[in-house]
Amino acid sequence: MILYEYPFNERIRTLLRLEDLFDRLEYFLGQDHAHQHHVALTTLFEIIDVAGRADLKTDLIKELERQRQALAPLRANPQIDQEALDAVIGEIEQGIAMLNQTVGKAGQLLADNEWLTSIRSRAIIPGGTCEFDLPAYYAWQHRPAEDRRADILKWVRPLLSLRMGTTIVLRLLREAGQSGKVIATGGSYQQMLSGRSYQLMQVYLDDSLLAFIPEMSANKYMLWVRFTQQDGDLRPRSVDADIPFLLKLCNF
């Protein structure tokens, strides 16, 4: 199955972007080539930009506190697996503690490091990080991979609490969904929300339907899923076929 997700609000959109960026950073940081570590570093800049646009730390703490308060009464329910519940609550409490220990905003790392600031200002220019532009960065790229990796990990460390908080919130949200099999008749599907509020829409497609691409949109009244296909030039074109898929609507 291939999964497509659509956020209903800006807060979840920001968390999904951070999740994707942290995954990308982890992948390229695990590689050894200097070019791959360059991608890891520019991804770190993107994370700082996304996380610094709002008071993300406060939002995550509030949401985690809300989830902890919602789960705590379940400890009195004998039908609940108490060991699993304690593990979830413990993870939430650990995430809250890590976020509370984080000092300053995400962008402070960049503001306090002139060397990183110089790379960031050149990285937004196409080809702006060549050796004649940033000789010190060029020299750093020739250091052993282990040294470069240690440096990037040091710069990433202040942001790890944001990653943990983001991971917990998104996992809890995805687990709080209602799913059902539906069919996009003539390549299009719409559903009234009947006043219900959701935060995330998921569309699961069978691997055999990989050629069909869902374009999703929603407002507080209705959601739409319209399928397209790419032609030889990869331009999207409408689909007239009936396409089955699994629709999941998630909300805390």
Curated annotation (Swiss-Prot):
User: Mind naming one GO cellular-component term on file for this protein?
Assistant: cell division site
Query: In terms of domain of life, where is this protein from?
Result: Bacteria
Which is a GO BP term held by this UniProt record?
FtsZ-dependent cytokinesis
Keywords (alphabetical) are: Cell cycle, Cell division, Cytoplasm, Septation
Please give the family membership noted in the entry: Belongs to the ZapD family.
Supply the NCBIfam families for this chain.
PRK05287.1-4
How would you summarize the oligomeric state and partners of this protein? Answer: Interacts with FtsZ.
Q: What is this protein called?
A: Cell division protein ZapD
Q: Which organism is it from?
A: Cupriavidus necator (strain ATCC 17699 / DSM 428 / KCTC 22496 / NCIMB 10442 / H16 / Stanier 337)
Primary gene name: zapD
